[in-house]
């Protein structure tokens, strides 16, 4: 399947960042060569509904931002951890449609940043080749 690019998502914890780094490195391998459009930090901070201007970095601060800078890719968004996301999901409503909440605004920011990243990618790189799966030795499920 030809891919325009990959968006790597992580949480701020070091163990999650290590996995995100492996993901970026995988996409950048010559045999895969899928452009990385950027990184998203999920559960970046906690914001209580009654104090929307307060940010509590319960899982650490700036982890994905630092990794993105280290790897030379863009940080596309820092998605906060808020109770209303779970409540909206339970009710079948997308979090992005919650009005001017911190999470809805950041999800809209993410969408805009992904569009910008795709536009930049399409100007600077040729179309991506299809990524094919193989049955190489060691990869078999038998």
Model feature map: region roles:
Residues 109, 113, 123-142:
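A short, charged, Gly/Pro-tolerant segment at domain boundaries
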Residues 1-87:
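Conserved catalytic-core segment of NTP-binding enzymes
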Residues 33, 116-124:
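Charged, solvent-exposed alpha-helical segments that act as regulatory interaction surfaces
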Residues 102-118:
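Acyltransferase
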Residues 24, 103, 125-128:
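Residue-level signal for alpha-helical context at structural boundaries
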Residues 83, 97, 129-130:
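A generic alpha-helix propensity feature with a strong bias for hydrophobic helices
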Residues 89-104:
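C-terminal boundary of histidine-terminating zinc-finger modules
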């Amino acid at each position: 399947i030809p891919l325009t690019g990959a968006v790597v998502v992580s949480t701020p914890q070091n163990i999650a960042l290590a996995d995100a780094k492996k993901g970026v490195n995988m996409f950048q391998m010559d045999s895969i060569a899928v452009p990385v459009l950027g990184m998203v930090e999920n559960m970046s901070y906690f914001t209580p509904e009654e104090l929307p201007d307060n940010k509590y970095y319960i899982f650490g601060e700036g982890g994905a931002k630092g990794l993105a800078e280290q790897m030379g890719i863009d940080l596309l968004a820092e998605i906060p951890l808020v109770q209303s996301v779970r409540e909206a999901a339970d009710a079948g409503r997308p979090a992005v449609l919650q009005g001017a909440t911190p999470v809805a605004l950041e999800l809209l920011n993410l969408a805009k940043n992904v569009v910008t990243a795709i536009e930049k990618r399409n100007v600077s790189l040729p179309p991506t080749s299809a990524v094919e799966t193989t049955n190489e030795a060691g990869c078999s499920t038998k």
